[in-house]
């Protein structure tokens, strides 16, 4: 038993790592910038409406890239628009995340074969963290993608790179048991 154990057990003191506090603050206050380019933008607006209420998850939309930490690319990205997508992405402060919403921004959508003017996926110009499939995806699917971003933030840390966190998230989707056990260990520690 250490010197502080008695003092901590008698009072309401919470002991945790700085890493987990920072991640909790970041995942509890996502500020997405919507980049709506086509019909997926309508579903993105519906997700922000009172029926789904993204603010209950701590997600507050912003219109400036300098105030956001998440870019939601929703819709068809043309070759001319790709330069602007990159410029807005570069204006976002670190750490920044990208969610690709819908078939058009994921892979070119119905224009992938004959659309010479359409980018065949926004991941060709900026790194994408989470893909939300659908044409257009329902608001529930977008909320699911935002939850994946929050899980990614929870897994990141001072010693954990984003690539490692993405790998761990992919493994957790196939077998969630190790992730559940790790969360239990963190709660008891």
UniProtKB/Swiss-Prot annotation:
NDH-1 is composed of 14 different subunits. Subunits NuoB, C, D, E, F, and G constitute the peripheral sector of the complex. [4Fe-4S] cluster binds at residues 39-40, 104, 135. Keywords: 4Fe-4S, Cell inner membrane, Cell membrane, Iron, Iron-sulfur, Membrane, Metal-binding, NAD, Quinone, Translocase, Transport. GO terms for biological process: aerobic respiration; electron transport coupled proton transport. Its cofactor is [4Fe-4S] cluster. HAMAP family: NDH1_NuoB. Its main location: membrane. NDH-1 shuttles electrons from NADH, via FMN and iron-sulfur (Fe-S) centers, to quinones in the respiratory chain. The immediate electron acceptor for the enzyme in this species is believed to be a menaquinone. Couples the redox reaction to proton translocation (for every two electrons transferred, four hydrogen ions are translocated across the cytoplasmic membrane), and thus conserves the redox energy in a proton gradient. Gene3D superfamilies: 3.40.50.12280. Belongs to the complex I 20 kDa subunit family. GO terms for cellular component: plasma membrane; respiratory chain complex I. Binds 1 [4Fe-4S] cluster. The keyword Amino-acid biosynthesis does not apply. It is an enzyme of class 7 (translocase). This is NADH-quinone oxidoreductase subunit B. It is found in: Cell inner membrane. It comes from Chlorobium phaeovibrioides (strain DSM 265 / 1930). Its EC number is 7.1.1.-. It catalyses: a quinone + NADH + 5 H(+)(in) = a quinol + NAD(+) + 4 H(+)(out). GO terms for molecular function: 4 iron, 4 sulfur cluster binding; iron ion binding; NADH dehydrogenase (ubiquinone) activity; NADH:ubiquinone reductase (non-electrogenic) activity; quinone binding.
